[in-house]
């Protein structure tokens, strides 16, 4: 049995990157049926993250700049992603097969 584990944040980033590539089929190619299933999984996964996290920070839209809807910058307190990545690399589970 193959054992593989990773932190959820890396799964989330993988899904965002996969969906980003779908926007550029001329660059990354079109997806097949398995890719569509994967895309649906990623969309649902990101939806669940948004619902579970339920960031209730108000977003204030102040108008348009250059034809695009503009919102005031929000203030975030973030975790140190570099430290998380380093910690995850040290603690990763190896294949125990």
UniProtKB/Swiss-Prot annotation:
Keywords noted in UniProt: Oxidoreductase, Virulence
Sequence motif HXXHC 1, residues: 11-15
Main enzyme class: oxidoreductase
Pathway per the UniProt entry: Mycotoxin biosynthesis
Short sequence motif named HXXHC 2, residue ranges: 38-42
InterPro entries with a match to the protein in the record: UstYa-like
One example of a Gene Ontology biological process annotation: mycotoxin biosynthetic process
EC number, as in UniProt: 1.-.-.-
Entry keyword annotation includes Oxidoreductase: yes
One annotated GO molecular function: oxidoreductase activity
Plastid in keyword set: no
Function: UstYa family oxidase, part of the gene cluster that mediates the biosynthesis of the secondary metabolite victorin, the molecular basis for Victoria blight of oats. The role of vicYc within the pathway has still to be determined. The pathway starts with the processing of the precursor vicA1 by several endopeptidases including kexin proteases as well as the cluster-specific S28 family peptidases vicPa and vicPb to produce 7 identical copies of the hexapeptide Gly-Leu-Lys-Leu-Ala-Phe.
Domains: entry comment: The 2 HXXHC motifs are conserved in ustYa family proteins and might form active sites.
Family label: Belongs to the ustYa family.
Protein's name in the database: UstYa family oxidase VicYc
């Amino acid at each position: 049995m193959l054992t593989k584990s990773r932190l959820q944040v890396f799964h989330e980033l993988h899904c965002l990157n996969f969906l980003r590539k779908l926007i550029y089929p001329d660059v990354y190619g079109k997806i097949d049926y398995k890719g569509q299933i994967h895309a649906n999984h990623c969309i649902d996964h990101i939806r669940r993250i948004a619902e579970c996290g339920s960031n209730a920070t108000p977003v204030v839209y102040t108008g348009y700049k250059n034809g695009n809807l503009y919102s005031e910058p929000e203030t975030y307190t973030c975790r140190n992603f570099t430290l998380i990545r380093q910690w995850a690399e040290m603690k990763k589970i190896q294949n125990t097969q």
